[in-house]
Amino acid sequence: SDVYKRQEPTILGGMKRVVDPRILGEEALFDILGFRIALEIGICSDIFRNITPEDISELEEIVKMGIVFENNEYAPVSEFTFHAKLYEITGNKTISEFQDIIHPVMIFVKNKFKDLLEPINIEMKEQGQIVTHVDLLNFLKNRDELGYRKAIEQHFEVYKRFLNSRK
């Protein structure tokens, strides 16, 4: 009977305990960042296969809240919530669990390397290359998987340029 069945440990449970961005070396931080970018691009087809009108409504609410909080300390919450919802849509619990691990790393990287990321962001903004959550949401609403795939890659371009400049 299931009553005596032990709770199965989560696949990333151990990783969650050891991934502390304050004690990780730069190479490990950059590897995690690169993994996150690859994961975001890799889950595109699952998102489009599983997304419901309710999911789109929820993402619309998240995006609205993100705009409200854009310039203060709530911005990371908006970032987390938007991408956590995308991970949830895949239906894969391990992917969702990864978001809990990667979020503190992303905040740490953004803060630690702010002076290096900012000029890349400014350059991309001047060239009209910034892809926002609003842009991503529009591709989802329009069921444009190819457009979304290109847009999510561009959404993380600032980090890709940053990582390439560190090699």
Residue ranges and their predicted role:
Residues S1-A38, S45:
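Short linear motifs at protein or domain termini
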Residues V3, S165-K167:
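Short, Lys/Arg-enriched, disordered terminal segments
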Residues G25, N92-S96, I122:
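Short, structured coil/loop segments at alpha-helix boundaries
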Residues I32-K114, T132-D135, G147-Y159, R166:
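Conserved amphipathic alpha-helical segments that form helical-bundle/coiled-coil interaction surfaces
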Residues D115-M124:
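Short helix-coil transition/hinge motifs at the ends and kinks of transmembrane helices
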Residues E126-G128:
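Short helix-capping and inter-helix turn/linker motifs at the boundaries of alpha-helical repeat units
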